[in-house]
């Protein structure tokens, strides 16, 4: 668990490092103002990323601005507009809706704000609008989970999926999960998706919807 937490902190630090490398080339300033926009801060993963970003900013003498849009893409876009208006040099961005991020990304590009996309990767058509991407191999993570389920439940299982269906990272994770089952059992039909619940990327919401589903 400690290693996983340190890896997430490193993700935030890497994002700040990438921002610094990009902005130095474009504008020789002693320090920069960096915006951080996750789609929620009710998830321990994103608070750990925030800790990593804050630590790296403190160590490099950069200023950090961040908001919690609370799983509201409209509010996230509005908060990013506010950060741009305040004069941020770069944005570390975890979009709520990876397929609907183009408007925000274009606004940043037009304003000269560098963007590092992390975790929930934008669609390939929008790659040219960002300056860097940091993400886990979510397909492989899902695959390994599916492989474990197949190997440890050889007779099959009823599966409850906790999803965030606007997040590409979750979509490919779930796809990888089912492939992991299919590739590692001869009776894949015995593994049934009995329900999909919306966790909204929130630990508390996920706990509540799973509790309700299991009753």
Segments (PLM) and residue ranges:
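A residue-level marker of the well-folded mature domains of exported/periplasmic proteins
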Residues: 2-8, 14, 25-215
């Amino acid at each position: 668990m400690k290693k996983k937490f340190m890896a997430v902190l490193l993700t935030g630090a890497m994002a700040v490092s990438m921002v610094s490398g990009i902005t130095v080339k474009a504008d020789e300033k002693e320090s920069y103002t960096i915006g951080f926009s996750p789609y929620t801060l009710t998830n321990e993963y994103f608070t750990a990323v925030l800790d990593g970003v804050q630590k790296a900013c403190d160590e490099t003498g950069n200023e950090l601005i961040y908001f919690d849009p609370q799983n509201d893409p409209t509010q996230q876009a509005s908060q990013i507009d506010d950060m741009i208006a305040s004069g941020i040099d770069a944005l570390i961005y975890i979009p709520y809706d990876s397929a609907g991020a183009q408007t925000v990304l274009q606004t940043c590009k037009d304003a000269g704000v560098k963007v590092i996309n992390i975790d929930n990767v934008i669609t390939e058509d929008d790659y040219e609008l960002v300056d860097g991407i940091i993400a886990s191999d979510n397909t492989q993570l899902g695959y390994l989970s599916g492989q474990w389920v197949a190997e440890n439940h050889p007779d099959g299982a009823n599966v409850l999926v906790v999803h965030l269906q606007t997040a590409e990272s979750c979509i490919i994770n779930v796809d990888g999960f089912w492939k992991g089952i299919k590739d590692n059992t001869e009776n894949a039909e015995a593994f049934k998706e009995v329900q999909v619940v919306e966790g909204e990327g929130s630990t508390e919401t996920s706990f509540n919807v799973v509790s309700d589903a299991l009753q």
